[in-house]
């Protein structure tokens, strides 16, 4: 079901700038028995994107009320909060736009995520490369055509997800989650200054690791670096933390054990 600015709707205006240009941002939030998880972190991430896009903030207290009304009361479920600049403007120009417009939808928790969390995920490697755009890197803006193309590439293969690299051949993420790995008891994760999305669960993983005294190296890494790992996991807000049990590169297939740190993170961050 969908709500637009708090009211049930089945359509959006054709002049909405998110429909026309992908002009806005969104966040997907896990809910537990009707309660939103990591709400403040999601707000902060949306605010960072809206600031970059020069879109006014909505009234977050009102948005929270709308979101709470929209949540399913299941043990686990999710909502998507989608913010558009609004309708209007001439061509690309945002001048004169009235907004923002907040659309909220709810959905059931994907049942297969439980199997992924327990047994791990086998990843492929996408040929589709992510572009370089430092202004938008890290933000979950509404133009996700790169992810659509990457996901289309792996549809129909044996893989549920795949590693994506950017045009500089640096590992960035999967099509739907952030990546971490361990090598010689050190933790690594790709930097997202040029490409990719900085997820809320990525932030929570970093915060937990730092609180436990781990030094995490955030930098540019190649596929070879990733394949040389001792332990790999992926994460997003809905999935939580899930082990990566193997990666099939074009000429190399590597299996990974489900490591102790992955299980420890799951015990502390997965709910």
UniProtKB/Swiss-Prot annotation:
Modified residues annotated as N6-(pyridoxal phosphate)lysine in this record: 140
Any one Gene Ontology cellular component term annotated for this protein: cytosol
Lineage of the organism: Bacteria, Pseudomonadati, Pseudomonadota, Gammaproteobacteria, Vibrionales
Cofactor(s) essential for the protein: pyridoxal 5'-phosphate
Annotated pathway: Cofactor biosynthesis; tetrahydrofolate biosynthesis; 4-aminobenzoate from chorismate: step 2/2
Species for this entry: Vibrio harveyi (Beneckea harveyi)
Keywords in alphabetical order: Folate biosynthesis, Lyase, Pyridoxal phosphate
MF-aspect GO terms: 4-amino-4-deoxychorismate lyase activity; pyridoxal phosphate binding
Catalytic activity: 4-amino-4-deoxychorismate = 4-aminobenzoate + pyruvate + H(+)
EC number: 4.1.3.38
InterPro entries listed in its UniProt record: Aminodeoxychorismate_lyase_IV (IPR017824), Aminotrans_IV (IPR001544), Aminotrans_IV_CS (IPR018300), Aminotransferase-like (IPR036038), BCAT-like_C (IPR043132), BCAT-like_N (IPR043131), Class-IV_PLP-Dep_Aminotrnsfr (IPR050571)
Protein's name according to its UniProt entry: Aminodeoxychorismate lyase
Entry keyword Lyase: yes
Family of this protein: Belongs to the class-IV pyridoxal-phosphate-dependent aminotransferase family.
GO BP of this protein: 4-aminobenzoate biosynthetic process; folic acid biosynthetic process; tetrahydrofolate biosynthetic process
SUPFAM superfamilies in UniProt: D-aminoacid aminotransferase-like PLP-dependent enzymes
Job of this protein: Involved in the biosynthesis of p-aminobenzoate (PABA), a precursor of tetrahydrofolate. Converts 4-amino-4-deoxychorismate into 4-aminobenzoate (PABA) and pyruvate.
Subunit-structure text: Homodimer.
Superkingdom to which the source organism belongs: Bacteria
């Amino acid at each position: 079901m969908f709500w637009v600015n708090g009211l049930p709707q089945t359509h959006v205006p054709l002049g909405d700038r998110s429909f026309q240009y992908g002009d806005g941002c969104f966040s997907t939030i896990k809910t537990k028995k009707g309660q939103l998880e990591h709400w403040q972190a999601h707000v902060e991430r949306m605010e960072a994107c809206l600031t970059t896009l020069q879109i006014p903030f909505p009234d977050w207290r009102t948005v929270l009320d709308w979101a709470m009304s929209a949540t399913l009361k299941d043990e686990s479920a999710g909502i998507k909060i989608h913010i558009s600049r609004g309708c209007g403007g001439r061509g690309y120009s945002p001048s004169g736009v009235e907004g923002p417009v907040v659309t909220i939808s709810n959905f059931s928790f994907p049942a297969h995520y439980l199997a992924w969390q327990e047994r791990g995920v086998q990843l492929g490697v996408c040929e589709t490369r992510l572009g370089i755009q430092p202004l938008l890197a890290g933000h979950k803006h509404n133009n996700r055509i790169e992810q659509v193309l990457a996901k289309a590439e792996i549809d129909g293969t044996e893989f549920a997800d795949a590693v994506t690299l950017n045009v500089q051949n640096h590992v960035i993420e999967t099509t739907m989650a952030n990546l971490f790995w361990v090598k010689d008891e050190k933790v690594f994760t790709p930097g997202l200054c040029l490409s990719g999305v900085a997820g809320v669960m990525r932030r929570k993983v970093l915060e937990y690791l730092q609180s436990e005294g781990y030094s995490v190296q955030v930098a540019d890494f190649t596929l070879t670096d990733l394949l040389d790992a001792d332990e790999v996991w992926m994460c997003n807000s809905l999935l939580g933390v899930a082990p990566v049990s193997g990666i099939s590169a074009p000429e190399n297939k590597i299996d990974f054990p489900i490591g102790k740190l992955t299980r420890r993170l799951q015990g502390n961050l997965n709910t």
